[in-house]
Amino acid sequence: MERIERDPETIYMLYTGGTTGMPKGVMYKQGEFLTFLFRTLKAMGYDVPEDLSDLEASILASKTNDEFIKSLVGCPLMHGTGMWLGAFLPLLLGGTVITTSNLGFDPDKLWAQVQDKKATNIVIVGDAFAKPMLDSLDRAKNSNNPYDIGSVKVIISSGVMWSAEVKQGLLSHHNMSLMDTMGSTEGGIGSSVTTRENPSETAKFAINPGVIILADDGEILKPGSDKIGLIGTSGLVPTGYYKDEKKSAETFKEINGTRYSFPGDYAKLESDGTITLLGRGSNCINSAGEKIYPEEVEEAIKTHNDVFDCLVVGMPDEKFGQRIVAVVSTVDNKVLDELVLIENTRKKIAGYKLPKQILFTDEVKRAPNGKANYKWAKSYAEEFQS
């Protein structure tokens, strides 16, 4: 088949997951997008062919050196994590992409496929996938029928918090690299790599070149600042949102002659140059004048061994404006005392960030891509308000 030459100015578009509103079409110039993908592969340590003529030799070398990629995509391909990290990157290296045939996420079937297909890479979306995967490994091991996951070299995640405790649990089953990437459809921000030898902290990332933290007053923050700010990246900036000039102007801005993408996440820039992710500004809860980010509270609550999943929302309050309410599911639907859970959470975060109410449910609802369904959580919480 004759090769089709594409204009690098051609628009490539992927829709956002619609976590904080209606899905938006994010537009990239195809040439810039491909350059970004190849840079990402190099940053991940892969040998990237210089041109098409080198591709066949590169694939043969990867098979000879046991470096051929077999990527199992655990999350939906409609999501940037699944499409870009799970499919595009391995395909650019001539690798194999493994998909699941069943609807919904089944961790037992995922590990069975890993065992059967000898997958080297697994792509997921944070704890929403990783925690059930860990539970599946634990059950299999306890029943003396563990999965053979020796082929796995790396698990890659993006889009949802991936807690340090769950990472360590996965590493107890197999020594591999756990790559936690931070970004969105609007641009990449940073990453964190965890191994048995090098543990990591939850929500802490080394930032990519061209990333800034912009305070609400317009100051570009320096490492060690006590302020928080919006994360902006100049690494790969979309041309805009499809047919949405207003939102494009709000998200993609020029600062000091450089164009940045501001997807809406807030962070603190630590003294060592890393960032601690706080969460999406549109989900921020304002309680008694304090800004509280749901993701930070959720991760603190989930440190309790009996908590399986959690979402935190702000509910109307006459005294504080909003009060923090947590919707929690427990491991095997165990009965958990609300006050005990609040006191355990107090060990991790400041008192004003603690939930004023905890509501228990059999299942915390999430989108198929693992993203938080705050609309459902708020609706659930409303049922219990007097």
Describe the residue ranges of each PLM region.
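Conserved beta-loop-beta connector loops within the AMP-binding
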Residues: 212-233, 271-272, 334-338, 372-373
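Conserved S/T- and glycine-rich ATP-binding loop of Class I adenylate-forming
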Residues: 10, 16-19, 71, 77, ...
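Gly/Ser/Thr-rich phosphate-binding loop
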Residues: 18, 92-95, 119-124, 134-200, ...
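AMP-binding/adenylate-forming catalytic core of the ANL superfamily
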Residues: 115, 234, 239-240, 250, ...
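AMP-binding/adenylate-forming catalytic domain of the ANL superfamily
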Residues: 347-371
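Conserved AMP-binding/adenylation subdomain of ANL enzymes
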Residues: 34-74, 78-123, 136, 140-143
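Conserved AMP-binding A3 loop
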Residues: 11-51
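Conserved pre-ATP/AMP-binding loop-to-beta segment of ANL
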Residues: 1-15, 21-22, 52, 60-71
